[in-house]
Amino acid sequence: MAIHDIGKAALAVILARTVFSQVPYIGAVAGVASVLGHIFPFYLKFKGGKGFASYFGMTLALNWKLALVIAVLVFAVTLITDYIVLGTTLTVFSVPAYLGIAEHSMLLALILCIATVVIIYKHRMNYVRIYHGTEIGLRSVMKGKHRMK
């Protein structure tokens, strides 16, 4: 369930920042670890989700204002293109770039890019289906023409 995925990543960031407050970028490291743990859970033979909800939770805890912006961005891109994956893609590229610039830290951007690369990889088949015209759009799902897996 997405709300749990958002919450666990946000909690990881908050706890890490609280317990290890003197360690630079510990929140980002904990957030990325949470995203990777969601994508590759050992108890599910390393076959988990695609990681965006956890990524959003991480972003929410790192910078809640940015999280609000990306929520609107994902919604807008999805409405315009009919594909959630395109909003997801724009977001996972935008967050490291924005936070790296805002915090004046290439290291922060690189830490966040670890999750970006893995999320993009996990969505690779969505991109292939969009290219071939076989990806099911959100409007089709909402109209009941297709069921999401």
Question: Residue spans of the language-model regions?
Answer:
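Hydrophobic alpha-helical transmembrane segments
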Residues: 27-32, 56, 67-72, 86-90, ...
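Membrane-helix boundary elements
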Residues: 28-46
